[in-house]
Amino acid sequence: MHDANIRVAIAGAGGRMGRQLIQAALALEGVQLGAALEREGSSLLGSDAGELAGAGKTGVTVQSSLDAVKDDFDVFIDFTRPEGTLNHLAFCRQHGKGMVIGTTGFDEAGKQAIRDAAADIAIVFAANFSVGVNVMLKLLEKAAKVMGDYTDIEIIEAHHRHKVDAPSGTALAMGEAIAHALDKDLKDCAVYSREGHTGERVPGTIGFATVRAGDIVGEHTAMFADIGERLEITHKASSRMTFANGAVRSALWLSGKESGLFDMRDVLDLNNL
């Protein structure tokens, strides 16, 4: 990667998240907007990326072909859909480009493809790029070690009506952080739905509840409930800009890294706390 500014390409440039990513890339020192991508046939092709994001003219036009811009970026930032992200991953692996992946909803095969690609390129892959959420994940590990063996653990998440996967990637990351702290596998202890005559709560499980409504950016709560008291740890996002800033910060952090799979805890050095 280049020693000067890190040049980033933004996937899904015309979407809600894509526009925020463009704004964040233009604002962060050490980062240069190198390319912006949209799907073939989009009415936004040929638009100036900065003007599209409400940030003024940049001279970077929205393209549909990665081949056309492969010499214009060092790190590809992708918050799109799993199938599109995996296509972009193959291209970046072939051409030695770093990636920041904020796409959620991957199946196990998709996650394995990301792990495999990290043998050749540097990737930051996270369910949530908010600093606050990642601090919360660390707090959940600590709380689980103290309270997890004797409390009922529930994770409640809420997002806007347009979100297509459930539970959210962040909710799953919360469950994984708690399960890991308890030396469990989330696959063995997660309960994703309750309906009808369920019987009493099974001890040692981690429950998930999902809300989809309106324009909620993202709210997540983990509950450790006992008889007589409960601890709740909550994060609420009021703007997608917090995710965009974290993603662009991650792209900058990848400077000088040739390969490896990282997450926001690496970027923020939370593993040493």
Curated annotation (Swiss-Prot):
Signal peptide (from-to): none
GO molecular function, one term: oxidoreductase activity, acting on CH or CH2 groups, NAD or NADP as acceptor
UniProt-annotated binding residues for NADP(+): G12, R16, M17, R39, G102, T103, T104, F129, R240
Enzyme superclass (EC): oxidoreductase
Catalyzed reactions: (S)-2,3,4,5-tetrahydrodipicolinate + NAD(+) + H2O = (2S,4S)-4-hydroxy-2,3,4,5-tetrahydrodipicolinate + NADH + H(+); (S)-2,3,4,5-tetrahydrodipicolinate + NADP(+) + H2O = (2S,4S)-4-hydroxy-2,3,4,5-tetrahydrodipicolinate + NADPH + H(+)
Entry's family note: Belongs to the DapB family.
The protein, known as: 4-hydroxy-tetrahydrodipicolinate reductase
UniProt source species: Escherichia coli (strain K12)
